[in-house]
Amino acid sequence: MADSGGIKVLSENRQARFQYEILETFETGIELLGTEVKSIRAGKVNLRDGFALVRNGEVWLHNIHISPHQQASAYYNHDPLRTRKLLMHREEIRKLIGKVEQKGLTLVPLKMYLKQGWVKVTLGLGRGKKLHDKRETERRRQDQRDIQRAIKRA
């Protein structure tokens, strides 16, 4: 899954694009411990239930499960669900604060990847989809599949 430019996607939150209408994306760094980096490089990360909050001018990532590293002892290992600090420029954070305070907007992690050796997280500013929006998305996806099948047969 290596893309050009030294980017290797380690984990993707595909469910977020179904549950949220993503309005804007941000690339952020993440503050990690050594064993967390090793686990992430091994692909042992789950972004599904994650979300980010802005507190005291800092962005924090919650509910991201990074499995403990297999080779490390329990003493040196990390807490799998600990809150992790995201690294962003102050201007980006100020911009986020204004947008997150709007009704119904939330920050969700979309993707975790390696970029030139550094672990990065793509955050999406999203609005939760209603049930009928999800059904519409599913209907559109099914129509696309049907069209592709028809083209393939012809």
From Swiss-Prot:
SUPFAM superfamilies on file: Small protein B (SmpB)
Signal peptide: none
Location within or outside the cell: Cytoplasm
InterPro entries according to UniProt: SmpB, SsrA-bd_prot, SsrA-bd_prot_CS
GO molecular function: RNA binding
Protein's GO biological process: trans-translation
Primary location group: cytoplasm
Keywords, alphabetical: Cytoplasm, RNA-binding
A GO cellular component entry from the record: cytosol
Purpose of the protein: Required for rescue of stalled ribosomes mediated by trans-translation. Binds to transfer-messenger RNA (tmRNA), required for stable association of tmRNA with ribosomes. tmRNA and SmpB together mimic tRNA shape, replacing the anticodon stem-loop with SmpB. tmRNA is encoded by the ssrA gene; the 2 termini fold to resemble tRNA(Ala) and it encodes a 'tag peptide', a short internal open reading frame. During trans-translation Ala-aminoacylated tmRNA acts like a tRNA, entering the A-site of stalled ribosomes, displacing the stalled mRNA.
HAMAP family registered for this protein in UniProt: SmpB
Protein name, per record: SsrA-binding protein
Species per Swiss-Prot/TrEMBL record: Synechococcus elongatus (strain ATCC 33912 / PCC 7942 / FACHB-805)
Gene name tied to this protein: smpB
